[in-house]
Amino acid sequence: MKHLTEMVRQHKAGKTNGIYAVCSAHPLVLEAAIRYASANQTPLLIEATSNQVDQFGGYTGMTPADFRGFVCQLADSLNFPQDALILGGDHLGPNRWQNLPAAQAMANADDLIKSYVAAGFKKIHLDCSMSCQDDPIPLTDDIVAERAARLAKVAEETCLEHFGEADLEYVIGTEVPVPGGAHETLSELAVTTPDAARATLEAHRHAFEKQGLNAIWPRIIALVVQPGVEFDHTNVIDYQPAKASALSQMVENYETLIFEAHSTDYQTPQSLRQLVIDHFAILKVGPALTFALREALFSLAAIEEELVPAKACSGLRQVLEDVMLDRPEYWQSHYHGDGNARRLARGYSYSDRVRYYWPDSQIDDAFAHLVRNLADSPIPLPLISQYLPLQYVKVRSGELQPTPRELIINHIQDILAQYYTACEGQ
């Protein structure tokens, strides 16, 4: 499992390559990603966050072992080699337990790390930046680093115990905004300063030394920083290389380290490529992929309304809206404004809070109904042109089958293609 270390080595040697991390648990997104990586013969990095997947099940209901089983089963069904699959754990630390005293939260974090490592996750993001119930706000670099070193020790011991060798690759640090897109409307974003990045690295190096973990420093492959990219509900802050140039140059002094950029969703292809060139060589993407899934489903629902009598339609859009109104916990604190503004946000926001609702049984039934309705007879080409114009071109050229499932998968892959191109290197 040396794909990441090798990628970093090549990048540091001047190749300007990178890797993207697919941060989603949706089966169609994962199928799209696995098929795309297979077609391009590249390794695939899939990550779960501490919110999605933990030892108690997370919001997906999956433990790390469950998630690995789910992904590996999907990979096997698509003939994707498991040795080309890299699993990562994102924001692993006390994130889920900030309402508990630090001692209790960190005990849970120890178990979280054990469960991820024992399940075979090899890329481990240690993030102890969040304050717990009895902590000062914000935490000092030293406290954050001490807690990360504690978790690294647990990770190393667990890896040796289960696999007989310590081959984990680590990411440290955190971006300033909360994971998964900003809550509030954005106008400008502070880029991590070189001094702050150096302070984080030195605090971690010192804390790792105190834990007797000097030997693993070359396996700390990336530092999470804020290069000045983010999105909120309707806006994207685009990467501005000039603002990040000092930060970009700073990492050139570390021979085994690159940067990891979170919230790169919705950046232009040019910005994604420039991020990789500027050493932000691990690009995280999640909401943009489920946003593309949602776009394709809304387009297919519009096609269905043109072709199928109203009483036989799936009503996917309305079912989705009804379930989100009935169970508002995943969007209520994120979407603001009057009723119409919130309605638009539920359907179309870049932050894509709708992604939390796809596993709901009513919505899943409506999705299956939609696919059945459109699979019965060929979708007329003019309707594909109207509602899925990018896919229409590929259908007409004969490279894409115009079935509902293939249209959805291909629309998601259009986003993956931007990341692949950005990461390919020279």
From Swiss-Prot:
SUPFAM superfamilies: Aldolase. InterPro entries: Aldolase_TIM, GatZ/KbaZ-like, GatZ_KbaZ_carbometab, TagBP_ald_KbaZ. One of its GO terms (biological process) is D-tagatose 6-phosphate catabolic process. Transmembrane segments: none annotated. One of its GO terms (cellular component) is plasma membrane. Pathway: Carbohydrate metabolism; D-tagatose 6-phosphate degradation; D-glyceraldehyde 3-phosphate and glycerone phosphate from D-tagatose 6-phosphate: step 2/2. It comes from the Bacteria. Component of the tagatose-1,6-bisphosphate aldolase KbaYZ that is required for full activity and stability of the Y subunit. Could have a chaperone-like function for the proper and stable folding of KbaY. When expressed alone, KbaZ does not show any aldolase activity. Forms a complex with KbaY. Belongs to the GatZ/KbaZ family. KbaZ subfamily. This is D-tagatose-1,6-bisphosphate aldolase subunit KbaZ. The gene is kbaZ.
